Amino acid sequence: MAKMESGSGSDTGLIALLIQINKALHRRTSEELLGMRLKQFLLLGYVGDRGAVSQQELETGLVMDANSVVLLLNETEATGWSVRKRDPADRRRHMVELTEAGKLAVARAEKAREGIEDEVMSDLSAEERKTLRKLLKRVLEGLLRVPAESTSQA
């Protein structure tokens, strides 16, 4: 594994560390998720966990804009992993479901993700992993509660 280049040693800010981790993980997962991009994996996993979901629910749940969700759905439909159907209760709305091929692709990618996570987190104990997961969830929840505009008005 490559050594981290942080510039200022232990003074590296949390945001900088999170960005470095994000870039390294994105590169690693993109290479190893069996031909599936990370965003595709997140979308398919979200749908797989919940069953049929609306495009609007995907926007909210994945913290993505409508155009990005549509482009991503176009990709996952083209690969045969998902399908959009009209909602019988509201014909204006589309519901997204996984195909059988999509369910298989998610299962394969999930196994790869577990292996990557075990390798990446190998220096942490089970308790440290649990703590890290809790802390990162709290940070994410806080970010989702605070509108982006309020953070830029300093």
Q: Predicted segment positions?
A:
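Short alpha-helical elements of helix-turn-helix
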Residues: 12-16, 36-45, 67
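Residues within helix-turn-helix
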Residues: 55-56, 67, 74, 94
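The alpha-helix within a helix-turn-helix
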Residues: 59
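N-terminal leader segment of winged-helix/HTH proteins
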Residues: 1-35, 154
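Short capping segments at the starts of secondary-structure elements
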Residues: 50-54
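Charged, amphipathic alpha-helical coiled-coil/dimerization segments
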Residues: 26, 74-141
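Short, locally clustered residues in the helix-turn-helix/winged-helix DNA-binding domain
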Residues: 19-22, 45-49, 110
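C-terminal regulatory/oligomerization modules of transcriptional regulators
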Residues: 1-6, 127-154
